[in-house]
């Protein structure tokens, strides 16, 4: 998995880390190419020892309410029971796990994550509504201006109409956001098989009474570090320019 540069996401992410007084919101949106690199290939070989890539794995039912009757299982007497569980191929499951590893490294390792920690979401509209409700309840009026910008940027990057949407819902021991003071969190994967790309949207709210600046994550530290490097380069001369091949993994997004 390779992180793809996206200036729109970078601008949005700066607005997804905010202090509301009662809580601190820390969110980010990232785009990843599903093209496997060296470490990914090695991990994929180990992953396939437990089952072939095409084998289907059972996922947990989505953590949603108000599901349509078509997504509810029925007893022999015809009575509605719990929500139906979806399945995904082991290769897709690997992509989800690899995305988590890339996004949270080096602080967390998700290599042992299992299919029951993931869910396939019932619809795009439900996910959009869930995200909007969480962020609006946290930042109120400030989210009204950000909302169209956010979803337009995601759609341009991944073509939402073509995506399968998954979520990561671990137990407390495995949850990277399960620290004391955590009010809510979500982790959504927008997977476009045609583009071989995943957009990962992760966000959490931490109670202001338990929040410490270090919990803002590596994003803030990296931003501060980059500013320091820029200041040093201005005073100490220009350094070697970095080159990037991230754009080589991109293909044009054409929504049909």
UniProtKB/Swiss-Prot annotation:
Region (Disordered): 58-85, 212-252
PANTHER family: REPRESSOR OF RNA POLYMERASE III TRANSCRIPTION MAF1 (PTHR22504), REPRESSOR OF RNA POLYMERASE III TRANSCRIPTION MAF1 HOMOLOG (PTHR22504:SF0)
UniProt keyword annotations, A-Z: Cytoplasm, Isopeptide bond, Nucleus, Phosphoprotein, Repressor, Transcription, Transcription regulation, Ubl conjugation
Protein name: Repressor of RNA polymerase III transcription MAF1 homolog
Post-translational note: Phosphorylated at Ser-60, Ser-68 and Ser-75; the major sites of phosphorylation. Nuclear accumulation correlates with a concomitant dephosphorylation. Phosphorylation may attenuate its RNA polymerase III-repressive function.
Location within or outside the cell: Nucleus; Cytoplasm
Acidic residues biased stretches: 218-231
GO annotation, biological process: negative regulation of transcription by RNA polymerase I; negative regulation of transcription by RNA polymerase III
Function description: Plays a role in the repression of RNA polymerase III-mediated transcription in response to changing nutritional, environmental and cellular stress conditions to balance the production of highly abundant tRNAs, 5S rRNA, and other small non-coding RNAs with cell growth and maintenance. Also plays a key role in cell fate determination by promoting mesorderm induction and adipocyte differentiation. Mechanistically, associates with the RNA polymerase III clamp and thereby impairs its recruitment to the complex made of the promoter DNA, TBP and the initiation factor TFIIIB.
Entry's Gene Ontology molecular function annotations: GABA receptor binding; RNA polymerase III core binding; RNA polymerase III type 1 promoter sequence-specific DNA binding; RNA polymerase III type 2 promoter sequence-specific DNA binding; RNA polymerase III type 3 promoter sequence-specific DNA binding
Biased segments, Polar residues type: 61-76
PTM sites of type Phosphothreonine: 64, 212
Subunit composition and interactions: Interacts with TFIIIB subunits BRF1 and BRF2. Interacts with Pol III subunit POLR3F. Interacts with TFIIIC subunit GTF3C1.
Record family assignment: Belongs to the MAF1 family.
Originating organism: Homo sapiens
Residue location of crosslink Glycyl lysine isopeptide (Lys-Gly) (interchain with G-Cter in SUMO1 and SUMO2): 35
Recorded consequence of changing residue 68 to D: No change. Weaker repressive effect on RNA polymerase III transcription
GO cellular component, one term: cytosol
Modified residues (Phosphoserine): 60, 65, 68, 70, 75, 214
Gene giving rise to this polypeptide: MAF1
């Amino acid at each position: 998995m390779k992180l793809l540069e996206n200036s729109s996401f970078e601008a949005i992410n700066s607005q997804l880390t905010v202090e509301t007084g009662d809580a601190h919101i820390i969110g980010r949106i990232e785009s990843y190419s599903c093209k496997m690199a060296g470490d990914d290939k090695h991990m994929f070989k180990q992953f396939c020892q437990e089952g072939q890539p095409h084998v289907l794995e059972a996922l947990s039912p989505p953590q949603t309410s108000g599901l349509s009757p078509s997504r509810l299982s029925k007893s022999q007497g015809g009575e509605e029971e719990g929500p139906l569980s979806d399945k995904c191929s082991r290769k897709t499951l690997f992509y989800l796990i690899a995305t988590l590893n890339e996004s949270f490294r080096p602080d967390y390792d998700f290599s042992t994550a299992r299919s029951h920690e993931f869910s396939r979401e019932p619809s795009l509209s439900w996910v959009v509504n869930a995200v909007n409700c969480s962020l609006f309840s946290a930042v109120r009026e400030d989210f009204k201006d950000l909302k169209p910008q956010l979803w337009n940027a995601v759609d341009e990057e991944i073509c939402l109409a073509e995506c399968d949407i998954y979520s990561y819902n671990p137990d407390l021991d495995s949850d990277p956001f399960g620290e004391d003071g955590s009010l809510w969190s979500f982790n959504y994967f927008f997977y476009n098989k045609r583009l071989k790309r995943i957009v990962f949207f992760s966000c959490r709210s931490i109670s202001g009474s338990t929040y410490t600046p270090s919990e803002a994550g590596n994003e803030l530290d990296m931003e501060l570090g980059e500013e320091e490097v820029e200041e040093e380069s201005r005073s100490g001369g220009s350094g070697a320019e970095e080159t990037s091949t991230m754009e080589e993994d991109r293909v044009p997004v054409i929504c049909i």
